[in-house]
Amino acid sequence: MSKVMETKQQVVTEIADKLRASKSTIVVDYRGLTVSEATELRKQLREAGVEFKVYKNSLTRRAAESAEMAELNEFLTGPNAIAFSNEDVVAPAKVLNDFAKDHEALEIKAGVIEGKLVTLDEVKAIATLPSREGLLSMLLSVLQAPIRNLALATKAVADQKEEQGA
């Protein structure tokens, strides 16, 4: 096998592994972004723990078929970049959606969330969800509320008895 074929096969394997391992994968069309805008987008994604790469569509198609995500192939036309997140399902959708609001040149095409193909509308809906940390803080506040209310009620009763005794 030629050196070029080996290199392409390694890239296909790399993409397929990333598709299988990622909890959230978003495909975007970055045509029209300036270099500074693309750099800013990469920085924001990196800070969110998201990997952002540009691959040839033909190699990405082979990798998607290898990873049993062939339905993604219909969105692989034109210049595409792919955002992979192994940690947070919401992070790539949130960062890309927020960036696309300010920069019309960035077009979200589709994504794969936990192995399921999602459309542009679903990606936008996912982007509105709070992050994992936000959900955990909401859960903790819900769990603490009854205890806090009990403590306040007990304190109010104690204060009332103290006033009656004085």
Swiss-Prot record:
- What would be one Gene Ontology cellular-component term for the protein? cytosolic large ribosomal subunit
Query: Single GO molecular-function term?
Result: large ribosomal subunit rRNA binding
PROSITE patterns, per database record: RIBOSOMAL_L10 (PS01109)
Against CDD domains, the record matches this protein to:
Ribosomal_L10 (cd05797)
Q: Its domain of life?
A: Bacteria
Q: Which UniProt keywords apply?
A: Ribonucleoprotein, Ribosomal protein, RNA-binding, rRNA-binding
Q: Does the keyword RNA-binding apply?
A: yes
Which BP terms does GO give this entry?
translation
Gene3D superfamilies xref list: 3.30.70.1730, 6.10.250.290
**Is rRNA-binding included in the keywords of this UniProt record?**
yes
Q: Give the protein's biological function.
A: Forms part of the ribosomal stalk, playing a central role in the interaction of the ribosome with GTP-bound translation factors.
Quaternary structure note: Part of the ribosomal stalk of the 50S ribosomal subunit. The N-terminus interacts with L11 and the large rRNA to form the base of the stalk. The C-terminus forms an elongated spine to which L12 dimers bind in a sequential fashion forming a multimeric L10(L12)X complex.
What's the family? Belongs to the universal ribosomal protein uL10 family.
Write the protein's name.
Large ribosomal subunit protein uL10
Origin organism is Bacillus cereus (strain ATCC 14579 / DSM 31 / CCUG 7414 / JCM 2152 / NBRC 15305 / NCIMB 9373 / NCTC 2599 / NRRL B-3711)
Gene name linked to the record? rplJ
